Curated annotation (Swiss-Prot):
Modified residues (Phosphoserine): S190, S192, S280, S291, S301, S314, S353, S487, S492, S553, S730, S743, S747, S755
Phosphothreonine modification, residue list: T106, T184, T217, T283, T365
Species of provenance: Drosophila melanogaster (Fruit fly)
Record: active site: D936
Sequence ranges of Basic and acidic residues compositional bias: 55-76, 315-332, 392-403
Region of interest: Disordered: 15-540, 574-661, 675-782
Main subcellular localisation: nucleus
The encoding gene: Cdk12
Chain intervals with Polar residues compositional bias: 85-94, 189-215, 224-255, 444-468, 586-603, 644-656, 721-731
Positions with biased composition (Low complexity): 163-176, 256-281, 408-422, 473-484, 518-533, 609-623
Protein name: Cyclin-dependent kinase 12
Biased composition range(s): Basic residues: 134-162, 495-508
Assembly mode: Interacts with cyclin CycK.
Length: 1157
């Protein structure tokens, strides 16, 4: 029980299905079965589907019979021996052929009953209750292994009857139909024929297909007789029946009772929407996806048929495949119908013939697990699992329901999951959503379920989508099917998860099954017997599985994040770069967990690849040329021997079942040609992210395409041309797809995952890199550096403000205070700009959002640098609870211009002013070039440190503007009033960079006169003050002024002439010229920041070479400090005589300041 709950939890952890599905009544019922034992099974609620409800109604007498039987047993507890014999006779009577597998259970039941009876002196009420409980526990254990789910127990009698009816030997027609199937995998399916009815896109790519690759829906099964006859659909029905019957001949005596007798009537299977159970263990239900999108009952077997047709090299092989398929069909029945011996079926079938068993472990062998998931709860679970036309609406429903149910119910998963996809449909189908990587994710998921799934399934099939990428060579697939057959993308999809499960889980589940019941024990024994023909293979597989346990769990956790794959590519590139540097001979070393770039190359050299197939390896590629990435679970990824690229033969690594890593470096291999030459029209080069080619692109277009990485492609192209030309379409030799301009564009922000599919893609680029020579090693580090710089940003918000020591408040903004602080870690001084979130309704201040957003896009030496963002809480929960504050961490600047000018502690000369203006205009010009308007330039926002460096700060009002759309209005209330240009004062909303130039002109004048040029407290008063110096805004000097909204409301008492040059005649002529141009009333005539930098006054100014101004290093002069100081001086002056106050009036060069007049 505990193992079951743990398994359910583990599956839930890695499943994409929302946890709310556990509240589903059916899921709850299933959980109840697991918790209370099958003995407490309640009457099931009506099935959601009509067919199922019908089937369940038919099976209801069976359920009632069981309930009565249990009640009778309770009443007859005084005669436990009789009860045990009754139970035994009941099971034996229904299925006399199952005696070998049930005998042990029966005898144990009788012994147990006798012991109870003998140990009890008298049968009183307490003993009766205790005995009832013990019987329930025993029954629970026994039925858990049988997967006697609530909804399945009703179907037992019918299934038995149907099983008996279908145990006839194979008819000649069936045998002919079986033998007529293709025994050699055809060439890779063409895009148009890839799927007949399935609703998914024609080219199945795990990463891209959202619909077909959704968690609940495995890839479509394809037609065996079309171009893509890997994926047989139309011909599956006949093949299924034929194969199934053939299988029955072999397995009939060894099949367990519960498995065989639980399939619904054949009539129910004949319809596309019928139940998911096969009529009998031997006859897989026909495939219904070809005819309808509804739940094909025998989709499990259908998939197997199509797989066998694709990969079987001979009728003999196909028969074997059929056997496995059939047993899987029963596995499905048994999985949810409570048959504990479906596992017997598979194992025994394998045990029948060592020769056949050899093929059982080849990739061509269809997975043993599919049928197990047949639950009967919903229409066509098998179909839902194997057919992709359900991908849309049904996949979601099935995924939610079945994945949870199967994972939660130990009974359901117990021995059935051994033959079914990872203990839960969702795990199988979810795999497809994640593409090749799903195998890892769900492999782990499955491993967490306490079931026998790992046993047979480990050999059973390759991974769904990834199954396609491996050839059928027995060696490569070995026993694990890790390089599972190039199964129809959907066929093995749900299977491989099992075989990915860790041996640890396998052992644990075995223990669970043995503890659960004698029948479970018997199935265990049968399983061990069935594995005997390949015991050495299994031992080898277990050893490798043990090595992969940690990797599997890591894959399952990391594959969830799509972006992490891209990071893996980068890491591989980095490692391979190192390898290329270290290996002077050019040998290519693949990353630890990387699997082969080309899953087919070893098979090309492998003599055991399908004889009838001209393109054995090509068969294992999907129609879009991408190999399914999932079926590499058991590669010894840490010790993949890499041959020298100078080797002329492919050296495969049978010990690790490495289909390919060995041939990765062999760019000039003639052996690579056969796998791809025949299928070159269907195969497209694999992109770095395993994505399909863009619309309208095909392999021929890319054959001579140049790689986006110039250094690499130069020589790799030569290699491609010299080796096999366009015929050699190996992934190793194909050019980079134009969609992705080289790995340089890959995002480096993501964490690294060790998913084999991720290593395949990068290997493409790295192969070119090795071919290209050392030039590539110079390019790659750039990516890593870029990634590092981005990663720094990801730390924002992770630190607490406690790492800083607050020293003093130096300012106050619209949304918080500004503090001077010291970083404890680096001992650097920083400025912390606090962002208060106390106004919850308003949310995060838009000014702060803009500042953060814009500063992240600006990088200039004259623009303040935003280091990071910190919070004042230790964790997010605390922050959310208390509505804390954010702090923007800036580099610290000792002063601002306002504080310096008002302090009276500095006396900037012309050279200092020129340096300040040059730096200010340099930063402003950078902003304007980036199409940003600052919109708040004033002295307090111009920062300066003690070294004389000037930086533009406070981008809270800044915004991006569209230089091409001058008609777009922006807010008019920007820029501090004293620095606001006349167009804004007159209501202009369609403004541009000229507003910032006006503000800079005000600062230029202020540098020379030591106080603001235009001081007023209202907009019209401000405009009047400007008019006194710069002249009145009239159409004669400003033609467009009449278009401004407030022009006609302007009631000036008199028209002023421009007297700027007269008032500022003390300024140097070049500086005065610049001031005159910057303070032009007409924004269209106003000088730009770029032109101002070229002005005679600033053209030759280099701030770095100029002497540092004499600044008060003992005092930080900021606006806040200046205001406090001014207040104190005012208070002091109020106590002084009026003559003293008058003497403090400031005049320079004999010019009375504006505002004093």
């Amino acid at each position: 029980m505990h193992a079951s709950s743990a398994a359910a939890t583990a599956l839930v952890e890695y499943s994409d299905v929302s946890s709310e599905d556990f509240s589903d009544q059916e899921a709850g019922d299933l959980d109840a079965d697991a918790g209370k034992g099958a003995g407490n099974i309640k009457k099931p609620k009506p099935a959601p589907d009509n067919q199922f409800s019908k089937g369940r109604l038919d099976a209801k007498p069976d359920k009632e019979g069981y309930d009565n039987y249990r009640s009778r047993r309770a009443e007859d507890s005084s005669d436990p021996v009789a009860a045990g014999s009754r139970q035994t006779s009941s099971s034996e009577a229904t299925n006399p052929r199952e005696e070998p597998s049930q005998a042990s259970n029966t005898s144990k039941d009788e012994l147990w009953g006798r012991e109870i009876y003998m140990s009890s002196d008298s049968i009183d009420t307490d003993e009766l209750e205790a005995e009832m409980k013990r019987q329930k526990r025993k029954k629970q254990k026994k039925e858990k292994h049988k997967h006697k789910s609530k909804k399945k127990s009703k179907k037992r009698k019918k299934k038995r009857a149907k099983s008996y009816s279908s145990i006839d030997s194979m008819s000649d027609n069936d045998i002919n139909a079986l033998l007529d199937r293709r025994y050699t995998p055809p060439t890779a399916p063409s895009k148009s024929n890839e799927r007949t009815v399935s609703a998914a896109p024609s080219s199945f790519t795990p990463h891209n297909l959202k619909e077909s690759s959704s968690p609940a829906t495995p890839p479509p099964v394809r037609r065996p007789n079309t171009n893509s006859n890997y994926y047989g659909e139309s011909s599956l029905e006949t093949a299924n029946s034929a194969l199934g019957s053939n299988l029955q001949v072999t397995v009939t005596n060894k099949q367990s009772i519960s498995n065989r007798l639980r399939s619904p009537p054949p009539s129910s299977r004949s319809s596309g929407n019928g139940p998911r159970f096969g009529n009998s263990p031997r006859t897989p239900p026909p495939s219904h996806y070809s005819s309808s999108g509804g739940g094909g009952v025998g989709s499990g077997s259908v998939v197997r048929d199509s797989r066998s047709s694709r990969y079987v090299n001979s009728p003999h092989k196909e028969d074997v495949s059929a056997h496995h398929r059939s047993s899987h069909d029963h596995g499905y029945q048994g999985r949810y119908s409570g048959a504990g011996s479906s596992s017997h079926d598979t194992r025994k079938v394998k045990r029948l013939s060592p020769e056949l068993d050899r093929y059982n472990h080849q990739p061509s062998t269809p997975p043993h697990k599919r049928r197990k998931f047949s639950d009967g709860r919903e229409v066509g679970l098998g179909n839902f699992e194997h057919s992709r036309h359900h991908s849309g609406k049904y996949e979601r429903y099935s995924r939610d329901r079945y994945s949870r149910r199967s994972s939660r119910s130990p009974s359901v998963q117990h021995s059935r999951s051994r033959q079914s996809p990872s203990g839960g449909l969702s795990s199988g189908s979810n795999a497809f959503r994640h593409g090749g990587s799903h195998k890892h994710k769900y492999g782990t998921t499955v491993s967490s379920t306490p079931s026998h799934t790992t046993r047979t399934s480990k050999r059973a099939s390759g991974t769904g989508t990834s199954g396609d990428r491996y050839s059928r060579s027995p060696r490569t697939s070995s026993r694990y099917m890790e390089s599972s057959p190039p199964s129809p993308v959907g066929a093995s999809g749900s299977h491989h998860y099992h075989h990915r499960r860790s041996p640890r889980m396998r052992q644990r589940t075995r223990g669970d099954s043995r503890r659960r019941s004698p029948s479970s024990a018997s199935s265990e024994s049968s399983a061990s017997r069935s594995r005997s023909p390949t015991s050495r293979d299994l031992k080898h597989k277990r050893e490798e599985y043990i090595k992969k346990i940690s990797e599997t769990s890591l894959f399952a956790e990391l594959v969830k994040d799509r972006h992490k794959r891209q990071k893996a590519l980068k890491e591989i590139i980095e490692r391979q770069e190192e390898n290329s540097n270290s290996n002077s001979n050019g040998a290519l070393t693949i990353n630890d967990n990387s699997s082969s770039v080309d899953g087919n190359t070893p098979n090309a050299a492998d003599g055991r690849s399908a004889p009838g197939s001209g393109t054995p390896a090509a068969a294992s590629t999907t129609s879009n040329g991408l190999q399914a990435l999932g079926s590499k679970p058991d590669l010894d990824l840490n010790n993949i021997p890499m041959p020298n690229k100078q080797n002329d033969s492919v050296v495969s690594n049978p010990a690790s079942n490495a289909d390919v890593p060995d041939s990765v470096a062999q760019l000039k291999q003639p052996l690579l040609v056969p796998p791809f030459s025949a299928s070159k029209n269907n195969i497209k080069p694999k992109s770095l992210t395993s994505l399909p080619l863009p619309p309208g692109m095909n392999v021929l277009d890319l054959a001579g395409a140049r790689s986006p990485s110039p250094g690499q492609k130069k020589e790799s192209d030569e290699k491609n041309v010299t080796s096999s030309g366009s015929a050699n379409k190996s992934v190793l030799n194909l050019p980079m797809p134009p969609v992705i301009p080289g790995s340089e564009e890959l995002s480096g922000d993501d964490d690294v995952i060790d998913s084999p599919e991720d290593f395949d893609a990068p290997a493409v680029g790295t192969v070119h890199g090795h071919g290209g020579g050392p030039g590539t090693t110079r390019q790659r580090p750039v990516i890593l550096n870029r990634r590092d710089s981005r990663n720094n940003v990801r730390d924002w918000g992770e630190r607490c403000v406690d790492v800083f020591e607050m020293i003093a408040q130096i300012g106050e903004g619209t949304y918080g205070q500004v503090y001077k602080a010291r970083d404890h870690h680096t001992n650097d001084m920083v400025a912390l700009k606090k962002v208060r979130l106390e106004h919850e309704k308003e949310g995060f201040p838009i000014t702060a959002v803009r500042e953060i957003k814009i500063l992240r896009q600006l990088n200039h030496r004259n623009i303040v640098n935003l280091h990071e963002i910190v919070t004042d809480k230790q964790d997010a929960v605390e922050f959310r609870k208390d509505k804390g504050s954010f702090y923007l961490v800036f580099e610290y600047m000792d002063h601002d211009l306002m504080g310096l000018l008002e302090s009276g502690m500095v006396d900037f000369n012309e050279e200092n002013n020129a340096s300040i203006m040059k730096q200010l205009l340099d930063g402003l010009n950078y902003c304007h070039k980036k199409n940003f308007l600052h919109r708040d330039i004033k002295c307090s926002n111009i920062l300066m440190n003690n070294r004389g460096k000037v930086k533009l700060a406070d981008f809270g009002l800044a915004r991006l503007y569209n230089a091409d759309d001058r008609e777009r209005p922006y807010t008019n209330k920007v820029i501090t009033l004293w620095y606001r240009p006349p167009e804004l004062l007159l209501g202009e909303e369609r403004y541009g960079p000229s507003i910032d130039v006006w503000s800079c002109g005000c600062i230029l004048g202020e540098l020379f006169v030591k106080r603001p040029l235009f001081q007023a407290n209202a907009e019209m008063a401000q405009l009047e003050t400007i008019s006194k110096i710069c002249g009145s805004p009239v159409p004669a000097v400003w033609p467009n002024v009449i278009k401004l909204p407030l022009f006609h409301t302007l009631k000036q008492k008199k028209t002023h002439r421009r007297r700027l040059r007269e008032d500022f005649e003390f300024m140097p002529a070049p500086a005065l010229d610049l001031l005159d141009k910057m303070l032009d009333l007409d924004p269209d005539k106003r000088i730009t920041a770029e032109d101002a930098l070229r002005s005679p006054w600033l053209r030759k100014i280099n701030p770095d070479e100029m002497p540092t101004p004499q600044l008060p290093t003992w005092q930080d002069c900021h606006e806040l400090w200046s205001k406090k100081r001014r207040r104190q001086m005012r208070e002091q002056q109020e106590s002084l005589p009026p003559t003293v106050i008058a003497s403090t009036k400031y005049q320079q060069h004999g010019a009375t300041m504006v505002g004093d007049a």
